Amino acid sequence: MDALASEEYASQSKLLQEFTNAPSIDGAWVFQTNNEDRSTAMYSISQTNLLANNKRKYILFSHIMRNGTNLLDFQWSPFPIQMDGVSAVVPSPSGSKLLVVRNGEKGSPTKLEIVDQSHVEKEIHVAQSVHGPLYTDEWFHGISWNQEETLIAYIAEDSPEPKPVFDDTGYRKEGSSEKDCNNWKGQGDWEEDWGETYSKKGRPSLFVLDINSGEVRAAKGISRSLSVGQVVWAPPSSCGRQKYLIFVGWLEHNGFQNTPRKLGIKYCSNRPCSLYSTLCPFEESDVDNAPASDSKLEPASVAINLTPSISSAFFPRFSKDGKLLVFLSANRAVDSGAHNATDSLHKINWPSDWKMDQYLEITDVIPIVMCPQDGCFPGLYCSSMLSNPWLSDRCTMILTSAWRSTEVILSIDVLSGKATRISPENSEYSWSALAVDGHNVLAVSSSPIDPPQIKYGHQVSLKDQTCTWVWDEVNNNPLMAANNKVKALLSHHQFSILKIPVTNPSDDLSDGSKLPFEAIFVSCKDSSHKPTILVLHGGPHSVSVSSYSKTSAFLASLGFNLLIVNYRGTPGFGEEALQSLPGKVGSQDVQDCLTALDYVIEGGLIDASKVAVIGISHGGFLTTHLIGQAPDRFMVAAARNPVCNLSLMIGTTDIPDWCYAVACGSEGRQHASESPSPDHLRLFYQKSPIAHISKVKAPLLMLLGGADLRVPISNGLQYARALRERGGEIRIMMFPDDIHEINIPQSDFESFLNIGVWFKKHLSISASDASA
């Protein structure tokens, strides 16, 4: 590395650390007090620790005080509390106790701590022979206290099947202990996992902890062909106890033609799933010891499928009065094959004394929106749900959902089915609900150039007897103080959301797919003279919302404009627009990106001669397509774990069905096979960036995660080597332990540091440009 390059690395790394060091809000809980005008909020905070290559986790508290004139005051704890080695924290319903989870490593037990308001009340060590680490991801994760706060249900890795044991005489029938060194364990049968992110993780299984005794029991009656998650307790029965557990189950026979295979589940809501019910394992002793003639007791049998009539059901939530079970469904994704699509919301009227063999009718609350009118509700697109989403009226739930290129907060009246946007309608910022506080909402808002700010929303009555939501800024927020340097670095930037008309729409397109798509434009002062980065999301059925991103903000601070395109196929714009892309990848999405670029060029917003492009996954697919199909329009490119050759990916990825869906469209499901036909392999190749590699001119930086199961490194390496063979300028960075996201802290840091240096080198940004 020459002196000039070394100086650039030093300068940019110092700048990037300013963005990396800022804390993030991961979640929050609100607890009521005896005073109805006061409550307490607990925040889960994380901060990147580059030296340790992990994230620090903190807990921070604030007291929320209101009065009759709607004045609001937040009193913050003086310092956050660091939670070393903690995998998850979950408060009890009353807020008087806290479960602290410390997942074991390398065969050590999992530690479950019950903390009250003054000390650790109990510490339970769960041996690996009972279960492995608890799931804390966004999909299988589920930890649920019962109302009496005596039992905790949770999802953990099941213990692996016993391995065959051998010694110098051959096979040992009786097995062996871990301490016996005179033998060795074989491998046994291969046990498939859920692909990307879940490599080497055990089967997600349901367990219940009795806090008083410290005993842990596995739920019974659940087939080993079912992976479970998102557990909640059903309301108390007539006996006054909560006897039943409700959970989500994913059948493992979801391969082609219903064959046994766990197709990858990360980022894929199209995996069939149902709500199930089973008896709490600590109720079984009552059943087993009862007289055979006692017909009032239910047998401890198999788990019951509560939603057999719908192909997808997840995020179960009971209303506060226990009369409704509400859940989301991705049945449109399951039925169409798109890996994400428009969600729907449903409810079940829950009987006060339900029996496991009792039929439950499903009613629609929010249906799928096909083609939204301009400015109207586009449908539900929810990647998560609050553990307690209910306002104090007991019939209104709070959801966070994508709404075109923004994220908004919605209130849903589950009785009438009315969806209302309660975050400001005239705001291009993105909003996300953190917690419900009675009839109020604690939230966070941000933009591409504004770090997250905590907001507090409450309803105000108007003269016409209607209500509106008012959002107050939270005073003395210590998290904002940590972001002051970042705000100063972005103070000369602005952003807007552009509506991009579809050019020359064909007659065979649906109405929804002819409507404008959008791009988020982050610009410097005098943007027309600054270089621009075209930023492309993956999926293709994911969305770039107008929220704060540390890495995007870093690139903007270097003096780049950012054009972040939500091409057709992006969630948040109605189902017709989303479904217009499958079967047309490499053409429709490529054209949308070029149309967005033309829009800002023709508007005089950017310099057409200074354009770079970057994307991850399907965004990398588009990046490598664009530099091949439009080689004279891009000076430089960077691709992170890109899809470059579908015909190679089909045999190596954890989601081969994705290859059929994006290339073949609606016909993909019927043709999908583990042994693609020559015609399909030819089609996959024709729709891939590698088909255009001979035309590439732009220098390309390729960043690969060595442990990526979604787009294995063979895909990127084949393209990179083929480009090098043709004399192209290519630089490869490999992160051996990283998965598809490349999100290990040091890898993430080094990735974007090199992207910044690479782009500045090939776009010739001066120091004065970056500071302007």
Curated annotation (Swiss-Prot):
It is an enzyme of class 3 (hydrolase). It comes from the Eukaryota. Its EC number is 3.4.19.1. GO terms for biological process: proteolysis. GO terms for cellular component: cytoplasm. The keyword Endoplasmic reticulum does not apply. Its main location: cytoplasm. Disulfide bonds: none annotated. It is found in: Cytoplasm. The keyword Cytoplasm applies. Keywords: Cytoplasm, Hydrolase. InterPro entries: AARE_N, AB_hydrolase_fold, Pept_S9_AS, Peptidase_S9_cat. Belongs to the peptidase S9C family. Homotetramer. Catalyzes the hydrolysis of the N-terminal peptide bond of an N-acetylated peptide to generate an N-acetylated amino acid and a peptide with a free N-terminus. This is Acylamino-acid-releasing enzyme 2. It comes from Oryza sativa subsp. japonica.
